[in-house]
Amino acid sequence: MKKLILYTLLLTISFSSAQKKELRNANKFFTSGEYASAIDLLDSSKEIFDSSDDKIKSQAMLLYGKLHTAMEDFELAMNAFDMSKNLGISDQLLNPEISKLETALITSAVGDNETENFSSAAKKLKMVYDLNKDNNEEYLFYAASSAVNSLDYPLALEYYEILRDIKYEGIETKFYIT
């Protein structure tokens, strides 16, 4: 019986260190800019992470989100950050990454508007709104405007109806120091 308990304990410890090692290696690939290698490593270790505790899973999903943000695959980044949040990662770790995702989405949407790819810009601006619905209402308005420019009137109407439902008026108060 003692051997069985000892064997189980050793197996658990080695399994836990393998998870952390894979996560560390993927993080090294990320910091060196080898995003595809990091994703491949995380994907190949998916079974290891699936059987791990929520803390390791949330760290893996946070890394997935960071990788997809860097690769401008914004929908997958949003999904990864959402899963990480649901698994209980701290807001202190998650909020800076969500801010980076917002910035990347806005920059990409502005680029799409400049190249007259209004449909893509509308979707990206809607994603910015979805990230923080309380503070990013104006981006939903911009998304609706981009949808109008892309001649996607049903989508624009949907966005304008959401704006009406949340009673968005577009009025801002700005304070100036004189």
Regions found by a protein language model. Name each.
Residues 4-13:
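Sec-dependent N-terminal signal peptides
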Residues 6, 17-103, 114-115:
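N-terminal leader/linker segments that initiate helical-solenoid repeat arrays
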Residues 25, 64, 101, 108, ...:
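Structural register within alpha-helical repeat arrays
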Residues 42, 76-83, 120-126, 155-164:
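Alpha-helical repeat scaffolds
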Residues 47, 86, 129-130, 162-165:
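Conserved structural position within tetratricopeptide repeats
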Residues 50, 89, 133-134, 168:
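Short coil turns that delineate tetratricopeptide repeat
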Residues 55, 99-100, 134, 170, ...:
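Residue signature of alpha-solenoid helical repeat architecture, marking inter-repeat boundaries
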Residues 60, 94, 138-139, 172-175:
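TPR alpha-solenoid repeat register
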